[in-house]
């Protein structure tokens, strides 16, 4: 029993005195801000617009990887990123003030998602997967409770079904996304991943009665086109 306690104590000390704890903390903060801004964006703009804006994480990740991780980026990617932000401008062009606020939240979410991707990319080269997952879960849960504890309601009886449905769909999405990369080529996954914009548009139209004007639709198509090729060139370079 004493021997077991000593081993457990040593393990706990090793975990919580992790020398990459600052990066784990930064990653958790990125995740919290991304999640909060993502939900705020969904409460203001349409489902299809929010899904499309989410793909701008490809632009931000390419830029951050060049600046922080010193990864090389070719001129084609730079031109595509600039062209992609033209699509965002077109989406914002006809927007009223509230919708513009939603686009800002969506872009902020995409930026912090990119920060999370960069931090995970760094951590995977320095720390093991179990530590990365554990620290993210523990730190995120603690910070969310600390920041939002006054607004947290544990009375979930009215929304229990929707919360369970949201949890199941999120877990299913993560599972099938992981399996798709295991069983198929990345180039094909890139193409198929854009189907979420189609699903978001259709579901938003059928269930939420959402509508998209022609200028916004053009902006969406530009973002789809540019992020597709940024991803494609990145995969080919790797």
Could you describe each region identified by the protein language model?
Residues 28-36, 58-63, 88, 114, ...:
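Hydrophobic/small/kink-forming positions within alpha-helical transmembrane segments
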Residues 18-29, 73-85, 102-107, 126-138, ...:
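Cytoplasmic-side transmembrane-helix entry/capping segments in multi-pass membrane proteins
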Residues 1-33, 112-116, 135-150, 225:
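Transmembrane alpha-helices of multi-pass small-molecule transport proteins
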Residues 76-92, 215-234:
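Hydrophobic transmembrane alpha-helices of multi-pass small-molecule transport proteins
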Residues 57-79, 198-217:
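C-terminal transmembrane-helix exit sites in multi-pass transporters
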Residues 12-37, 100-109, 154-172:
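Loop-to-transmembrane-helix transition segments
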Residues 95-155:
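Transmembrane alpha-helical segments that form core, pore/gating elements
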Residues 50-56, 123-138, 174-206:
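Helix-helix packing/entry segments at the starts of transmembrane helices
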């Amino acid at each position: 029993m004493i021997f077991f306690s000593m081993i457990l104590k040593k393990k706990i000390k090793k975990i919580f005195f992790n020398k990459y704890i600052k990066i784990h903390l930064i990653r958790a903060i990125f995740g919290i801000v991304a999640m909060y801004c993502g939900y705020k964006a969904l409460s203001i703009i349409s489902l299809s617009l929010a899904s499309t804006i989410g793909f701008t994480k490809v632009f931000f990740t390419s830029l951050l990887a060049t600046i922080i991780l010193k990864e090389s980026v070719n001129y084609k990617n730079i031109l595509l990123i600039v062209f992609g932000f033209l699509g965002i401008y077109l989406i914002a062009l006809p927007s009223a003030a509230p919708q513009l606020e939603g686009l800002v939240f969506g872009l902020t979410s995409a930026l912090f998602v990119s920060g999370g991707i960069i931090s995970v990319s760094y951590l995977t080269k320095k720390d093991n997967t179990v530590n990365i997952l554990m620290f993210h879960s523990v730190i995120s849960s603690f910070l969310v409770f600390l920041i939002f504890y006054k607004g947290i309601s544990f009375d979930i009886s009215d929304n229990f079904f929707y919360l369970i449905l949201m949890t199941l769909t999120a877990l299913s999405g993560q599972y099938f996304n992981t399996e798709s990369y295991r069983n198929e080529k990345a180039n094909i996954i890139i193409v198929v991943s854009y189907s979420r914009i189609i699903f978001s548009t259709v579901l938003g139209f059928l269930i939420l009665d959402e509508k998209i004007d022609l200028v916004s639709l053009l902006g969406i198509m530009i973002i789809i086109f540019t992020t597709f090729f940024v991803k494609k060139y990145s995969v080919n370079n790797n």
